[in-house]
């Protein structure tokens, strides 16, 4: 199979995305978390659709996705779980609720969800066979499916308790974001080739819009444990605002990444982080836990907004610095852990 050249600005965008994931799992001012959670997980689905290339759904395709997405999920989930045999079935089920019951790292919900979304999106692309209007019909069906799943979750106690296997309800939403990413590429490439000043203006305007709209969309129930929208638990608030914020900010961040790639010469570390975002997703929680023990010992305490942001920046640096040797060791000795 012909190897596709990586787009540096996509790796820049993955760096931005995984950085937001890290900050999103810290104690930060509520406004910061509300803004981050408005779009940071949809961004990764958008980027997947953005980099899509035509391929048949055959054994080779499925085995590659199992190796690069599902196997890393299983291995990391088993590493972080309590080690009880009963945990294995919950991990294989793959929902966020089941991972919580298994006592493993719930942020891993994204991987089985992403795996299912990739398959759904590939099915959509294989069905349309060049008839792009059919893709809009498929998007409508995906959204209807997501609404039905959301209704059943509220009506069926078992679904409410365990969630859907592979977070299938969120995978339907993820596939919609992938479709958006597929169309975004044509627009971004047009901006990139001819209209850089217009791209700058567009990015600024989109940031301005979502700096307001991200704060007016709250989940239906203001649960103190989830005071903001959150894709992992299906807390969307107003669905229209959720999709608008996620799509506009994803487009803005891709545009910002294009500009960053053009303007910044030395960015090896940024590209390295973006290219290894999967590993960082899987290990950053453990490093953050260690960092939370270190920060008070170096005098970084306090609960004010400024103090929390400073602690967050220092913790972020610790995560990146400690992730680098972990990434290199995994690549050298256990590449299968990250699907290599």
Predicted regions and their residues:
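Alpha-helical transmembrane segments and their immediate juxtamembrane cytosolic regions
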Residues: 1-340
């Amino acid at each position: 199979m012909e190897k596709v050249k990586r787009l540096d600005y996509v790796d820049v965008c993955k760096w931005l995305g995984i950085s937001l994931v890290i900050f999103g799992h810290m104690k930060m001012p509520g406004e910061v978390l509300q803004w981050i959670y408005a779009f940071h997980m949809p961004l990764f689905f958008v980027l997947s659709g953005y980099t899509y290339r035509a391929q048949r759904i055959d054994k080779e395709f499925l085995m590659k996705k199992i190796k690069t997405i599902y196997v890393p999920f299983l291995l990391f989930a088993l590493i972080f779980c309590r080690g009880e045999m009963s945990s294995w079935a919950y991990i294989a089920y793959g929902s966020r609720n089941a991972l919580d019951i298994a006592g493993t790292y719930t942020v891993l919900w994204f991987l089985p969800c992403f795996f299912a979304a990739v398959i759904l999106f590939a099915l959509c692309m294989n069905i349309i066979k060049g008839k792009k209007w059919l893709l809009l019909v498929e998007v409508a069906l995906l959204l209807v499916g997501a609404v039905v799943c959301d209704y059943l979750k509220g009506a069926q106690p078992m679904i409410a308790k365990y969630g859907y296997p592979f977070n299938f309800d969120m995978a339907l939403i993820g596939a919609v974001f992938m479709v958006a990413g597929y169309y975004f590429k044509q627009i971004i490439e047009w901006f990139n080739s001819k209209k850089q000043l217009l791209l700058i203006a567009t990015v600024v305007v989109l940031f301005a819009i979502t700096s307001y709209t991200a704060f007016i969309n709250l989940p239906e129930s203001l649960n103190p444990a989830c005071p903001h929208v959150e894709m992992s638990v299906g807390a969307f608030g107003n669905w229209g605002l959720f999709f608008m914020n996620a799509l506009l900010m994803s487009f803005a961040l891709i545009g910002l990444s294009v500009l960053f790639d053009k303007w910044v010469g030395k960015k090896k570390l940024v590209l390295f982080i973006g290219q290894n975002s999967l590993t960082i997703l899987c290990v950053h929680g453990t490093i953050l836990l260690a960092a939370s023990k270190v920060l008070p010992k170096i005098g970084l305490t306090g609960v004010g907004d400024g103090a929390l942001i400073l602690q967050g920046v220092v913790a972020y640096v610790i995560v990146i610095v400690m992730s680098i040797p972990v990434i290199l060791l995994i690549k050298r000795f256990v590449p299968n852990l990250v699907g290599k």
